[in-house]
Regions:
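Phosphate-binding/catalytic loops
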Residues: 83-134
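Short, charged/polar "capping" segments at the starts of alpha-helices
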Residues: 39-41, 82-85
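Short glycine-rich anion-binding loops that position phosphate/pyrophosphate groups of nucleotides
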Residues: 11, 80-83
Length: 134
């Protein structure tokens, strides 16, 4: 089954979700991530994923346009902006939306920022495990 995970920048939430689902259920799902306005993979996302043994340091931010015309079984949007600007996919594609906070928007110390990234990572992992179990 093919899964595309979308957020705005393809810099944190969707990158972490791609790494998590690929790590936890990559034998079942072919996983991709993209953004409606791609930027760069956040170093904090790389750090907190490394803490749970998942390396996303080789990931790059991709535009959803790179996947135009491709078929996916599921498109999961993990931010409200991506849901609103999500391109049209074939009718057979199941769309799922999770409104996940943007950890990069958290103001405060570096430690507080990493705490926000960890919280988002853990929320994504819980949601993705439930998704994978059907």
């Amino acid at each position: 089954m093919r899964v595309l995970i979308l957020c705005t920048g393809n810099s944190a939430r969707s990158q972490m979700a791609e790494g998590l689902l690929r790590h936890d259920a990559g034998n079942v799902y072919e996983v991709f991530s993209a953004g409606t306005k791609p930027s760069h993979v956040r170093p904090e996302a790389i750090t907190v994923m490394r803490e749970v043994g998942i390396d996303i340091s080789g990931h790059r931010s991709k535009s959803v346009d790179e996947f135009a015309g491709q078929d996916f079984d599921y498109v999961i949007t993990v931010c409200d902006n991506a849901k609103q600007s999500c391109p049209v996919f074939p009718a057979k594609t199941k769309r799922i939306h999770w409104s996940i906070e943007d950890p990069a928007a958290v103001q405060g110390s570096q430690g507080e920022g990493l705490t926000a990234f960890r919280r988002v990572r853990d929320e994504l992992r819980a949601r993705l495990r439930a998704f994978a179990q059907g």
